[in-house]
Amino acid sequence: DGDLHVRSQVSSRTELGQLSDSFDHMIAKTAELMDERLRSEEQKRKSEWKALQAQIQPHFLYNTLDSIIWMSHAGRNAEVVEMTSALALLLRSSIGDGSDTNTLKKEIAHVRSYLTIQKMRYNEKLRYEIDLDPQTEDCLLPKLILQPLVENAIYHGIKVKQQGGTVRIESLLEEDRLLITVEDDGVGMTPEQLETILDKKESDAESTKIGVYNVNERLQLFFGPDAVMKYYSTPGVRTMVMLVLPIVRGKEEDSHAED
């Protein structure tokens, strides 16, 4: 009846007894594997929920709506339309269609909407560049995986730099791996800061760090140990995060995120 806690009652050391021991071992191993799978699925669900929570923080939404109201009062109608459209696309791609994956092309469309809003809020202090290799567009990623990395670059690199700076996103194929980099020419990070950025305990106190830790966790759940996320930084010069991932191809089902 599917009861994995059942055990055979044979106690003899005969061949039948050995068979009974093998049966017990097989049942115990099966139960262990099922428990491990359940734990993994639960961890995956929790990670995905945290990811959705991290995408659109209330303060970001409030600030964006405040900016829209302020621009409307100032008669900057074209900018109101642009920011409202970007926010609508951002919300739509965050809610999505129930899938837990996106093509890189859709991920970049989501990030572009986010950057459009942030650039309008910070004016000339924030610039961005996106260089996407066409051969990487249909590569699959866990959904909403790039925004936390871009957000971290803005808030810990560009925002705190007096003259602002540029966020650059790039993708390319290298042998059998997909490489994605998010780089900023902001204030950089010290070796001590780099050590804490992927530390769960340290991340619990700060939303952007929670997002970065969650990115790494979800990459491991999706790709396994072949997924690598590395941070490089020079204080006062730049910070770069590099994702080195297995290539998993998907289909571009629709283009709504880029209308």
Go through the PLM ranges and name each one.
Residues D1-I56, F60-Y232, R238-V244:
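Two-component histidine phosphotransfer core
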